[in-house]
Amino acid sequence: MELFRGVLQVSSNVLDCANDNWWCSLLDLDTSDWEPLTHTNRLMAIYLSSVASKLDFTGGPLAGCLYFFQVECNKFEEGYHIHVVTGGPGLNPRNLTVCVEGLFNNVLYHLVTENVKLKFLPGMTTKGKYFRDGEQFIENYLMKKIPLNVVWCVTNIDGYIDTCISATFRRGACHAKKPRITTAINDTSSDAGESSGTGAEVVPFNGKGTKASIKFQTMVNWLCENRVFTEDKWKLVDFNQYTLLSSSHSGSFQIQSALKLAIYKATNLVPTSTFLLHTDFEQVMCIKDNKIVKLLLCQNYDPLLVGQHVLKWIDKKCGKKNTLWFYGPPSTGKTNLAMAIAKSVPVYGMVNWNNENFPFNDVAGKSLVVWDEGIIKSTIVEAAKAILGGQPTRVDQKMRGSVAVPGVPVVITSNGDITFVVSGNTTTTVHAKALKERMVKLNFTVRCSPDMGLLTEADVQQWLTWCNAQSWDHYENWAINYTFDFPGINADALHPDLQTTPIVTDTSISSSGGESSEELSESSFFNLITPGAWNTETPRSSTPIPGTSSGESFVGSPVSSEVVAASWEEAFYTPLADQFRELLVGVDYVWDGVRGLPVCCVQHINNSGGGLGLCPHCINVGAWYNGWKFREFTPDLVRCSCHVGASNPFSVLTCKKCAYLSGLQSFVDYE
């Protein structure tokens, strides 16, 4: 039998209106195994017993009803509340409220001096359906309360008649065998979709389920297999199925529920790397034509080494090294590669710097976090370290409070140093060491060709599927001791499938501090693009550097132009310091008297420990020094690409780029 449940609130004002019939009632209450009833507690016990007596001899819809009434004191205010559990052949959701209110108010009418009425609040689900779990509610909630919390209780349900007002039984109810409600009516046919509300132990589901539930389960599995996690992707993959489901309100709700379950399954129950691998390995055999492979080779990285690390990193198997940092100047493929990886995972979130109060609003419940060109402020540095290190934490969300964020892989793309922490108008490096311990950094220094195009999910799947199928040992050798800087390419350990692909241009240097095979002359300083030489907010020249060879063009190849500027224009257009002041010995550089060259530090004098052949900082200092010396003694010889053939001197004098290139500022000051 279905038993409905609800609550009646009895305020203290109702008891103030009690008449003599209520106070002087001779109703016998058995309190032999119960706490003594005094004052208003006795009034409520009399009232509850009077309602039960009337219900036993009433007719209409309440005839033959089972009931369980329990009155309790309010915790935070004066007064009482009555738990009502009842059900019968004539009761249904339509007449339940009217019948219960009529029964209690008819009895109350003869016990008060004023016209006071009680209101019944039935228990309902969030969808507006009535709870029908009265049996479980009695066993798991009402009968587990003991006197002082419970004022009085009455019932006509077998098994509870003698025990409902037994303090001894209630105190041992959790160990005693619970009685069951036995009726001739089969109560297993409850309406679908209504909550049972049980508090008992969770029992694994062993049933076969209904046809609708099996169909819904099949739909969720289909979404995961076809990598459909958004409504737009669903429309593209199977528009007919989406249209049929959207035609009804219940179908639209199924779409949202199925997508949520598919996302949960993909982010928590299935390794993320499975979505980055191609199902057909035969389609990934021509790996040398892959755009990502060409990009990484151009940046002087081994595509196999990077790919194996990405597969391990995306599955959260790198420990504290939970973050990939793509660092370099614009147009080098950083964001292109990061977004291609992000679009290949089930669902990704982005750190939003437009809202400084809630930058991590989109991080919770994602497979990957993309951090594009951001800064770390002192107010969020601790949360940022937890997220970058893959540690569980809580972040604030707008209009939602704080939510838990488990370890999620993070990929960062930036032109500046992300390890600097900003606090007001100051910048500190106190947290730099802790942040670097959570990252693996890849330097992107070679600009990509304009016709490279966007990297796609197919490129990522082809690249990573090929990497997953290779058994190359040099990744494990590096993974034993993770370093902050990702190791550069090793020609001896390069996979045979990659040997025929160009590795790096003649004018580029190792992005990870690798060894150069040729001695660098002073004239070649102006053709270098070195790490740190591009840290500027001022835009670079739009004119590309002409190529040094006529070989086949690939991702990082420079392009030709009819208007050619000075060969060092792009390389030297950098703000390493104030470009109009003279360099200071001991501050900006150290002079190597043996070779007659500037170096970055005393340790690199006479090529000990580095020098021009190994240290990129020494190369930067040399290019800076020679460029300054060249501009000082040739003030008006070099011009930008727009004024190469200009005859009007005022056009050159007013051009900021010409002033930077040829030292015209010092020339004007002198004149």
Swiss-Prot record:
Record-given protein name? Initiator protein NS1
Region annotation (Endonuclease) maps to 1-176
**Highest rank taxon of the organism:** Viruses
Which InterPro entries does the UniProt record give?
A: Helicase_SF3_DNA-vir, NS1-Nuc, P-loop_NTPase, Parvovirus_NS1_helicase, PV_NS1-NUC
Q: Where is the composition biased (Polar residues)?
A: 533-552
- Point out the gene that encodes the protein: NS1
Question: Residue ranges for motif Nuclear localization signal?
Answer: 177-180
CC per GO annotation: host cell nucleus
- Gene3D superfamilies, alphabetized: 3.40.1310.20, P-loop containing nucleotide triphosphate hydrolases
Summarize where ATP binds, as residue positions. Answer: G328, P329, P330, S331, T332, G333, K334, T335
**One Pfam family here:** Parvo_NS1
UniProt keyword list: ATP-binding, Covalent protein-DNA linkage, DNA replication, DNA-binding, Endonuclease, Helicase, Host G2/M cell cycle arrest by virus, Host nucleus, Host-virus interaction, Hydrolase, Magnesium, Manganese, Metal-binding, Modulation of host cell apoptosis by virus, Modulation of host cell cycle by virus, Multifunctional enzyme, Nuclease, Nucleotide-binding, Transcription, Transcription regulation, Viral DNA replication
Instruction: Give the record's GO biological process terms.
Output: DNA replication; symbiont-mediated arrest of host cell cycle during G2/M transition; symbiont-mediated perturbation of host apoptosis; viral DNA genome replication
Presence of the UniProt keyword Glycosyltransferase in the record? no
Report the enzyme's class at the first EC level: hydrolase
Which EC number(s) does UniProt give?
Answer: 3.1.21.-, 3.6.4.12
Q: Which reaction does it catalyse?
A: ATP + H2O = ADP + phosphate + H(+)
What terms describe the molecular function in GO for this protein? ATP binding; ATP hydrolysis activity; DNA binding; endonuclease activity; helicase activity; metal ion binding
Q: State the span of motif (RCR-3).
A: 141-145
Which family does the record assign? Belongs to the parvoviruses initiator protein NS1 family.
